[in-house]
Each structure stands twice: as C-alpha cells, then as structure tokens.
Amino acid sequence: MFKKIDHVEIVTDQLERTVDFYTDVLGFKLKARDRSDRSSLGVPLQLVYLELGGTSVELMAYEGGSVAPAPADEHLGYRMMALEDRR
C-alpha cells in the first residue's frame, strides 16, 4: 500500500527564485541550507531542504551551471521507486 512521498530532488539554476516559489506560493518551510565545495560533477553544489506535510523537497544548484529548457515538442519523465522494510 502506498503511504507517502518521502522526498523529491530538483536541480535548478535559479535557486533563490525556486526557494521563493516553494515557500511563498506552495507553503513549504525552509529546514536547512548546505553547500558542498566539490560535487560529483567537480563543481560546488548548493542545497536547500524544504518540508511540507511530511514530504521533503531538496533543491540543488550546481555553481556555474545552467539548466537548459526542454524542447517544446519533447516530454521527459522519470519514474523511480525505493522500498524500505520497516518491520
């Protein structure tokens, strides 16, 4: 049985604008900020952790990077499931 969405990770090149949208428009609460000097891509990474109703959103911004918009005629979707046995 499905119980909840635990967390979602979103990569953005407009971190503060994205934080404002999630907090001011959607009502998420800011939980923490973090920064890693060297990410797996070899550049610094900024992280923002938000929460609403038991669901966390992790915003990630790679310093010096940009996120290109998808072409208008293209749809991109990801599906992933992680199961945890809590017996």
What kind of feature is each model-predicted range?
Residues G53, M60-G64:
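Generic beta-structure capping elements
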Residues V67-A68:
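A cross-kingdom feature marking solvent-exposed beta-strand/loop segments within repeated
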Residues E9-T55:
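Core segments of cupin and vicinal oxygen chelate
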